[in-house]
């Protein structure tokens, strides 16, 4: 395959536009970081660091923290009616007076208005790229993104897993035989039961490197003795392969609806019919998948009501970012601002290989801090976001740049024009403060 690759090498000229695009990105990042860091540090007599990726990332954390700080809880009410076997509840009611009136009017018997039975089929998610693995490791084990990357790099150097810094969650078609051999190491006949095996092979979805897998040798011989943290990551990667190729999770869902005095009461139930891939997820969960079993009911059945309760609840603020949710937000940042039909090389803030470093850098520079699993903006971080221009703290700028860089790679836009625009934006900002 190496000889074949050498024989079919493309001309270097074919990649000149791609080179210009990559060079322009590096220069633009340098221009923004060098000029804006010095600008804001001099203006406010603080050691501030500004970057195209790190500042919008900090902005997302700071804005979320501000939303939580400014959130005012509002009470609302639900009326719950109790039968012998289960309870039904209303939707949100804003007035306690109305909720109390409704509760007092509930009769001793109510008729079932509707029963909705459905079969819910859930397919397994794709294989791991680096970001998806970092998110899963943070969710299941509390590992930071950097810790996961370090453990993964160690496993890679021990030849137990494939290349770690990938942004693809699929494999190429020519890997199918190898994957089948991997599955056969789990147990005889497993490969024949791998009903979703074809879903993980998509040539068009593989960029420079395919999804993260255990190596065939590791699957055949076992990973050997590993530090506990590395063992957790290896087991998670192996379980992901088995999960992605296994059958779907099939659940039976039931919704019972009762209408009274123009108000809808409902109860929902769910039971697992076929566990499928979920069997490989369970070992990593603290709690088993909850099942709520409702009695068999039909439209027109009479329910004997034992009582009714008015429950007060409160609206909830958004949750602080964890590394899991921040990585997802970085991956999706600015995606809605990319024009349809344009394929960009990089979407979101950073790359799978750099996002962990961005988070650690923000912590090291004192802009954010860890509070258990949460990531919080510090006073210094909040101060920086308050003073930085909206243009340079918004992920929209990243989307705009990536669209232009994509056009440069396609030969449809000039790198000189792109960099002139960057220089103009920076000059305008500096001139604004000089007035």
Mark where each language-model region is.
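Toprim catalytic domain recognition across nucleic-acid enzymes
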Residues: 1-334, 339-367, 372-374, 379-386
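Leucine-rich, amphipathic alpha-helical/linker segments
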Residues: 191-212, 393-434
């Amino acid at each position: 395959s190496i000889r074949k690759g050498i024989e079919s090498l493309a001309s270097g000229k074919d990649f000149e536009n791609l080179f210009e695009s990559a060079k322009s990105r590096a220069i633009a990042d340098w221009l923004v970081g060098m000029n804006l860091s010095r600008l804001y540090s001099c203006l406010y007599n603080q050691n501030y660091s500004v970057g195209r990726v790190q500042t919008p990332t900090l902005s997302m954390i700071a804005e979320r923290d501000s939303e939580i700080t400014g959130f005012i809880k509002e009470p609302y009410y639900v009326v719950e009616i109790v039968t012998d076997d289960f309870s039904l509840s209303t939707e949100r009611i804003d007035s306690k007076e109305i909720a109390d009136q409704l509760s007092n009017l509930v009769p001793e018997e109510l008729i079932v208005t509707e029963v909705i039975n459905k079969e819910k089929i859930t397919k397994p998610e794709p294989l791991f790229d680096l970001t998806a693995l970092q998110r899963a490791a943070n969710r299941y084990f509390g590992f930071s993104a950097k810790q996961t990357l370090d453990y993964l790099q160690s496993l890679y150097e021990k030849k137990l897993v494939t290349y770690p810094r990938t942004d693809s969650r699929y494999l190429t078609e020519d890997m199918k035989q190898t994957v089948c051999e991997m599955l056969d190491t789990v147990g005889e006949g497993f490969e024949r039961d791998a009903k979703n095996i074809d879903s993980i092979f998509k040539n068009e979805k593989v960029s420079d490197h395919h999804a993260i897998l255990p190596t065939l040798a590791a699957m055949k011989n076992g990973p050997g003795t590993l530090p506990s943290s590395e063992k957790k990551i290896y087991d998670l990667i192996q379980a992901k392969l088995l999960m992605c190729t296994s059958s779907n999770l099939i659940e039976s869902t039931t919704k019972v609806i009762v209408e009274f005095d123009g108000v809808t009461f409902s109860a929902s139930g769910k039971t697992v019919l076929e566990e499928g891939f979920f069997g490989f997820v369970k070992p990593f969960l603290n709690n088993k998948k909850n099942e709520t079993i409702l009695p068999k009911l039909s439209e027109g059945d009479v329910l004997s009501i034992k009582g009714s309760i008015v429950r007060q609840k409160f609206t909830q603020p958004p949750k602080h970012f964890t590394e899991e949710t921040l990585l997802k937000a970085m991956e999706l940042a600015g995606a809605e601002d990319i024009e349809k039909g344009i394929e960009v090389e990089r979407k979101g803030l950073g790359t799978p290989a750099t996002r962990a470093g961005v988070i650690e850098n923000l912590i090291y520079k004192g802009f954010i801090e860890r509070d258990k699993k949460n990531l919080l903006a510090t006073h210094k971080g909040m101060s920086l976001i308050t003073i930085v221009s909206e243009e340079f703290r918004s992920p929209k700028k990243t989307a705009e740049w990536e669209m232009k860089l994509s056009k440069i790679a396609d030969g449809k836009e000039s790198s000189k024009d792109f960099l002139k625009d960057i220089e103009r934006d920076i000059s305008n900002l500096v001139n604004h403060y000089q007035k």
